[in-house]
Swiss-Prot record:
GO terms for molecular function: methyl-CpG binding; RNA binding. Expressed in an erythroid progenitor cell line derived from peripheral blood. Expressed in glioblastoma cells. This is Chromatin target of PRMT1 protein. One of its GO terms (cellular component) is nuclear speck. It comes from Homo sapiens. Residues 151-204 are annotated as: Disordered. The modification Phosphothreonine is found at residues 33, 242. The lineage of its organism: Eukaryota, Metazoa, Chordata, Craniata, Vertebrata. Residues 153-206 are annotated as: Interaction with PRMT1. Plays an important role in the ligand-dependent activation of estrogen receptor target genes. May play a role in the silencing of fetal globin genes. Recruits the 5FMC complex to ZNF148, leading to desumoylation of ZNF148 and subsequent transactivation of ZNF148 target genes. Plays an important role in the tumorigenicity of glioblastoma cells. Binds to 5-hydroxymethylcytosine (5hmC) and associates with the methylosome complex containing PRMT1, PRMT5, MEP50 and ERH. One of its GO terms (biological process) is in utero embryonic development.
Length: 248
């Protein structure tokens, strides 16, 4: 039954040429010579360059383009001042002695009330939270006020304070956060004054050597590289050392 169900297939249009011969003949007929390829590419480039030249000529003849070419200025004339400091203003890491907050001027930063710190005779430097002067207490988040201190128009009134020159973001001055009368303000954590450096009215007002801008910047970088826990530990140690009565 299998032999009966498989009829014989007869192909009428057959050829004795092999596939290799057939494709070889097709390749010979279609392949152009390299000389023809180079000639065609040069012809296309010449046509494109002619079009570009015509387009450039048309653009030059336009009145708007001619007016723009007449007003052509040099790069310095168009840019104006090339001094970066003149355009950006005072650099952030400026020397702080009178640079950001002068003698007796408050610094207001990061959402502090407009009243700032009023009262007292020394420069008040305040960052996000507040400070008590003469190293008595730290107002964390503005929720606590040091004892023996009165409020005056939304600020703190103290007996001493940090020394000359306020501290802003990236600047240093004489009397900020730190140990015994020198240091910096870091990362908006609040600050306190150096011990007795309020214009020579406190305890132990000492003469300090004047530091250069590079030394102040190096101290600031070293301070800002410390972690929050390290700063809190230093602050607690300083508070316990300067005014042990607040721990009672």
């Amino acid at each position: 039954m299998a032999a009966q169900s498989a009829p014989k297939v007869v192909l009428k249009s057959t050829t004795k040429m092999s596939l290799n011969e057939r494709f070889t003949n097709m390749l010979k007929n279609k392949q152009p010579t390299p000389v023809n390829i180079r000639a065609s590419m040069q012809q296309q480039q010449q046509l494109a360059s002619a079009r570009n030249r015509r387009l450039a000529q048309q653009m030059e003849n336009r009145p708007s383009v001619q007016a723009a070419l007449k007003l052509k200025q040099s790069l310095k004339q168009r840019l104006g001042k090339s001094n970066i400091q003149a355009r950006l203003g005072r650099p952030i890491g400026a020397l702080a002695r009178g640079a950001i907050g002068g003698r007796g001027l408050p610094i207001i930063q990061r959402g502090l009330p407009r009243g700032g710190l009023r009262g007292g005779r020394a420069t008040r430097t305040l960052l996000r939270g507040g400070m008590s002067l003469r190293g008595q207490n730290l107002l964390r988040g503005g929720r606590a006020v040091a004892p023996r201190m009165g409020l005056r128009r939304g600020g703190v009134r103290g007996r001493g304070g940090p020394g000359r020159g306020g501290l802003g973001r990236g600047a240093m001055g004489r009397g900020g956060i730190g140990g015994r009368g020198r240091g910096m303000i870091g990362r908006g954590r609040g600050g306190f004054g150096g011990r007795g450096r309020g214009r020579g009215r406190g305890r132990g007002a000492l003469a300090r050597p004047v530091l250069t801008k590079e030394q102040l910047d190096n101290q600031l970088d070293a301070y800002m590289s410390k972690t929050k826990g390290h700063l809190d530990a230093e602050l607690d140690a300083y508070m316990a050392q300067t005014d042990p009565e607040t721990n009672d």
